[in-house]
Amino acid sequence: MSQQQQPSTRLATTICFMKSALETPERAALPPLLQGASNFRDVGGYPTAGGQRVRRGHVFRSDHLAALTETDVARLKALGVRHSLDFRGTAECTSTPYAIDGVERVALTIEPTVVARMQTLVAQGVVPSTEETVALMCETYRDFVNHNAGTYGRFMKHLLEQPTPQVFHCTAGKDRTGFAAALLLSALGVDRATIEHDYLLTNQLYKRDARLEGQGHPHVMKVLWQVQPEFLHAAFDAVDQQHGGMDDYLQGAIGLSPQELAELQRMLLED
């Protein structure tokens, strides 16, 4: 048997390990704040166009919470977090469940469609180039804008309805969560350059499963397990070109009234 994997076999291995990472709580590296969630961070502290700042200690973003240590849980509770808003898909939640005493998990399901798209390519024996993989990710972000607005609307409404600190997350805390953070910061008046800075922090913080190292096509894995400005730009372009801009998108597809936007800003901004 040849020791060199055929292209379709190698890509199938890539997808297999992606799905494994989506559905397992084990983590390879210790993060700076939470040992079991390397991409956990406060979305507060950023300046707005109106001269205010996003309040710290009220909203946090993260990768999944299924691998938290007892110390992590204690830290989460010390932060006052009472709700976790979970964007993971059905299989992810089933395979990697969590229950944290005193923290209510709210399911805001968005399936990881890029995995399904890659599986289709595997079935066709196709190995996408770096450019094609980037294009797949950009398509995923456009789908967030055009096909998942209802879910993101529920996310924003939940932030409005619950005054206590909350954390929102998906599996890696980079794509579904990254767009959610971009929406929230946009609603609060943070400029896009600053939003992009927050978005790209994932590349410094997120530690993927060590079993993924060396698996599949490196050029595919590099795209799938990092964030790139092009991904976020694709979402913003869809907002601008198909929905008339962020203000219209927030008040249209997302479903926030001007009064609700003002209340969100009152809750989460400070002088």
What do these predicted regions represent?
Residues 172, 176-177:
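Ser/Thr-glycine-rich phosphate-binding loops at phosphate-binding pockets of nucleotides
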Residues 4-6:
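Low-complexity, intrinsically disordered transcriptional activation domains enriched in glutamine
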Residues 2, 11-167, 179-271:
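Cys-dependent protein tyrosine phosphatase-like superfamily
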